[in-house]
């Protein structure tokens, strides 16, 4: 693995290896040990979108591993004044050992990977959120003991999270049902890939179908960053897609809930459902740091 731009193209073995490494980093940290596997390494954290969890977990994780993380917002870079992405990539590649980038367009990540000459990791784009779904998979496996054979349901917008849930969950042997309103389908190439899994994948407009007999239910915000002008229309379109107690009752009694946060209580998730599943949702928020450590260790330290 040279980069982590999306989950598509990763083998099940590569995904599970990252989860295994993340488990080990968590075990060691709980024992008071943080291996300095990034000693002498510098990572550029290029963020065109705001972030609480991804930014802070990366900064803390890189520090714990003995490395340096430099946060660069859009206003810190000359790309804001017209410098081509490929030129910024070439410069960062001379200074840093890796780049983690949260941006809007997937093509920006592709350009960074092509021209920087160093590993590039997606911190989220409009197309995919691979670190998040790897973290979800780690959290589900911790609690369920396995991934293969579980049913995953996603209720909400067929956007970046849904794209990565489809690819990641199918790759590790889960059955996936995605429920989204008409006009909010996942990416065409992701749906094409999902077809290869036959009846292990279902796309529906019925959120109850996604919830029925689920082992884990995923959801995400209805209005993602950059969509603020569409907010009212989206809220109307997503009426009936709230993960509420009635919908949870359709799932298995021990069904987990995963939400990437921040959560909009009363929109994509009911307040009582979020609180009932807060432990697993915030376990996932914690686990992000271990997955990020694992990805950087695989890319930079030969783990």
Model-flagged regions — what are they?
Residues 48-60, 142-219:
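Glycine-rich phosphate/diphosphate-binding loop of Rossmann-like nucleotide-binding domains
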Residues 109-125, 229-251, 276-278:
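A short, gly/pro- and small-residue-rich
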Residues 1-56, 60:
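Positively charged, low-complexity intrinsically disordered leader regions
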Residues 195-271:
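Rossmann-like adenosine-cofactor binding region
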Residues 97-168, 259:
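Anion-binding alpha/beta catalytic cores of soluble intermediary-metabolism enzymes, centered on
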Residues 254-255, 260-303:
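Adenosine-phosphate binding glycine-rich loop
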Residues 42-43, 47-95:
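Active-site cofactor/substrate anionic-group-binding motifs, chiefly glycine-
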């Amino acid at each position: 693995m040279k980069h982590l731009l999306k989950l598509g193209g990763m083998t099940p073995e590569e995904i599970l290896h990252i989860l295994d490494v993340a488990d080990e980093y968590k075990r060691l940290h709980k024992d008071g040990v943080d291996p300095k596997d990034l000693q002498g390494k510098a990572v550029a954290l290029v963020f065109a979108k705001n972030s609480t969890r991804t930014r802070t977990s990366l900064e803390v994780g890189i520090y714990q591993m003995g490395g340096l993380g430099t946060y660069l917002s859009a206003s810190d870079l000359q790309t804001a004044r017209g410098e081509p992405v490929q030129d910024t990539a070439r410069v960062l590649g001379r200074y840093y050992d890796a780049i983690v980038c949260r941006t809007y367009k997937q093509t920006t990540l592709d350009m960074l990977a092509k021209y920087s000459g160093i590993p590039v990791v997606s911190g989220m784009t409009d197309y995919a959120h691979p670190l998040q779904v790897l973290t979800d998979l780690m959290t589900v496996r911790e609690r369920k003991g396995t991934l293969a054979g579980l049913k995953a349901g996603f209720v909400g917008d067929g956007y970046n999270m849904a794209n990565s849930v489809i690819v990641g969950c199918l790759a590790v042997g889960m059955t996936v049902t995605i429920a989204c309103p008409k006009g909010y389908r996942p990416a065409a190439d992701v749906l094409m890939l999902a077809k290869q899994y036959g009846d292990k994948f279902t796309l529906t407009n019925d959120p109850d179908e996604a919830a029925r007999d689920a082992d884990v239910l995923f959801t995400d915000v209805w209005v993602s960053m950059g969509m603020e002008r569409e907010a009212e229309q989206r809220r109307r379109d997503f009426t009936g897609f709230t993960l509420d107690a009635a919908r949870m009752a359709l799932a298995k009694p021990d069904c987990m809930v995963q939400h990437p946060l921040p959560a909009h209580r009363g929109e994509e998730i009911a307040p009582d459902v979020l609180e009932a599943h807060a432990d697993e949702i915030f376990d996932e928020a914690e686990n992000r740091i271990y997955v990020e450590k694992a990805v950087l260790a695989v890319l930079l330290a030969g783990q």
